[in-house]
Amino acid sequence: MPCIQAQHGSLSQCAGPCDNYVPDILNSEFGKFTMDLVNSEIAASTSLPSFSTFMDGYTGEFDAFLYQIPSSNQQSSLKVEEFQVFGCYPGSFTNQLDETMSSSGSDYYGSPCSIPSPSTPGFQNPQLPTWECSYGAYSPTQNYDNMRHWTEQQKNSISQQTFFSFGTPAHSPNMAANPLKIAPATHRLDQQLVDTDVFALAQNSSAGFPAVPLGQAPGVLDSSVLLDSPLSPSKTRSPSSNEGRCAVCGDNASCQHYGVRTCEGCKGFFKRTVQKNAKYICLANKDCPVDKRRRNRCQFCRFQKCLVVGMVKEVVRTDSLKGRRGRLPSKPKQIAESSPVDLINSLVRAHIDSIPSSSKLDYSKFQETVPLQLEKESSVDVQQFYDLLSGSLEVIRKWAEKIQGFVDLPKEDQDLLLESAFLELFILRLAYRSRPEEGKLIFCNGVVLHRTQCVRGFGEWIDSIIEFSHSLQRMNIDVPSFSCLSALVIVTDRHGLKEPKKVEELQSQIINCLKEHIPSSMNEQNRPNCLSKLLGKLPELRTLCTQGLQRIFYLKLEDLVPPPPIVDKIFMDTLPF
């Protein structure tokens, strides 16, 4: 068996009566402890650190310390022949014994030291007492003869640190009840500790030594951390653990993707499928195996397994968010609320800028009487009808862009609102500008035509427009009220809006402006129910719009003149059926 021996300095002669009993202490029968090392890990051989790592720079005197540990891979017992302690340890014990003596001051402590061995009759192995110094009480055996050297004080002693401490180990089911444990204490050269102890023999223990973590490396024994816990094997991850595996195919996975721990391959497959809205078909029974080797065989089953394990489609960024990691779609801009005065002023300005001035009206084509012609419309009349409609569309578009808050809407919503309300705005603006009593129709480009000049192109629709113009002008609506009414025609809920909430907010602002303006503009006779009468014109406009669509449809069937693309698009988009 290997023998590990460490000796520091020379044996110094202690001052006092303790000198007489040094041979007894050096006796090989000083202590015999029987301990069973049932754990193969404890019985394994190990290398312990040299005492020079602890005692560098020490200038005091030392005693000898020798111990032997068997190096057998089999379970063995450590007996007195295999574990022998010779001599004393660095420092002196006598200075501390006065502190640990009982209050009774037993005379037994004054007797010389003689520890019986297992071969002596006075030795009782099962009832081994406790041995402590400055940190506990020491009771060797019931025979206290020759123990006086424990009570003798040594003068001019040098207190040193404890290099090994023995304590009661925590119970471990994998280890023997009394394994050996050697714990290195902190080795510091810049301070000296007083009242240090050397050994503490545990009570209720046949051996008195706690567990030795012999499986630890020498570097661990050199550390300043006391190895107070019993040896326990390090936890290792079981091969069957699913941690770090892809939940879809079982490949290696380092982190979570879309809510589930998946590999990079399944992450990319799931992302591409969701972004492209791909549809897969299983050629088998929709139960194809999906693993690392066969995950590319059936895309349908692979995607279904992605959904089953919990991958979330909503987390995948869409095409509009590519390259914008960590950024969410910006919140839609709310319509900036302005004061009613500012809003109504902007509406009036937009209306005035979109109508021809009285000094620029074009009467070159105006004729009160026309020669008798056939009731059948001609291509010239139809072309004139289309030109008036398409010319009004561009004027109305420019007018709508000047409405405060309209340009803040999405471009798609602007086009949808304009095309849906075009015919209604054409009728309303024509009815407000015209002079129905004189039979004059003033169009937005400044052209003035008589009613008889428009009958063959507009048909009966023109009569309905003139009748509506009569009823509208009898209400004596001022320009601010009419400007608000025109804005309400285009700013209203339509099917297919992307942001109907913003349209609704702008509509509410316009209605509030109209409510605040009407009481100050109308006289007392016209003030009651004026707002309801004014808003009641909106359903009439819807009816007139339907008649206009019917007229366009009729002219398309006649096929005398093909309609302009913009008129044809508006017709097809605004059909109620």
Curated annotation (Swiss-Prot):
The keyword Lipid metabolism does not apply. The keyword Isomerase does not apply. A zinc finger (NR C4-type) spans 246-266, 282-311. Binds 2 zinc ions. Residues 500-523 are annotated as: May bind lipopolysaccharide. Keywords: Cytoplasm, DNA-binding, Inflammatory response, Metal-binding, Nucleus, Receptor, Transcription, Transcription regulation, Zinc, Zinc-finger. Residues 247-333 are annotated as: Required for binding NBRE-containing DNA. One of its GO terms (cellular component) is transcription regulator complex. Residues 563-574 are annotated as: AF-2. GO terms for molecular function: DNA-binding transcription factor activity, RNA polymerase II-specific; double-stranded DNA binding; lipopolysaccharide binding; nuclear glucocorticoid receptor binding; nuclear receptor activity; RNA polymerase II cis-regulatory region sequence-specific DNA binding; zinc ion binding. Residues 339-574 form the NR LBD domain. Residues 243-318 bind DNA. It is found in: Nucleus; Cytoplasm, Cytosol. Its cofactor is Zn(2+). One of its GO terms (biological process) is cellular response to corticotropin-releasing hormone stimulus. Orphan nuclear receptor. Binds the NGFI-B response element (NBRE) 5'-AAAAGGTCA-3'. Belongs to the nuclear hormone receptor family. NR4 subfamily. The NR LBD domain may bind the lipid A moiety of lipopolysaccharide (LPS) in the cytosol. This is Nuclear receptor subfamily 4 group A member 1. It comes from Xenopus laevis. The lineage of its organism: Eukaryota, Metazoa, Chordata, Craniata, Vertebrata. The gene is nr4a1.
